[in-house]
């Protein structure tokens, strides 16, 4: 039962907070800093995450129309922060070994994905292989959820804003060419 606490806490926070009120793309971006299990090196973590875990997540994400799932292979330190919180849970930074990013249309979609039997029986148990589930947030040491605002997409400027401002900075930029 403890294994289910974190996914349901994330889903409940998202649903209760109404954080899907996107004004531009209509989508929500979740960025999660992940801590590796103590028995794996950072390189082993990255390799397993990309080659073993990602193929388990991909069909589930596609089924739920997740727009984008990305992994960033990077390490560092961050203040532990629970999903939906605007304040850190502690003042001491914690290590992280990667960043997972999900872009999705609604909080309900993410909640349904995290409650799906495939997630509970295949994906979540696999997380125990390479993620430090004893760490803050069950290894998701900091999670931030916010509105997705596209500025450049497909090598194109897609910023939506004041036309005069756009023209001003297009002109300034052109003066540097």
Q: For each of these PLM feature ranges, what is it?
A:
Residues 1-21:
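Fungal secretory targeting signals
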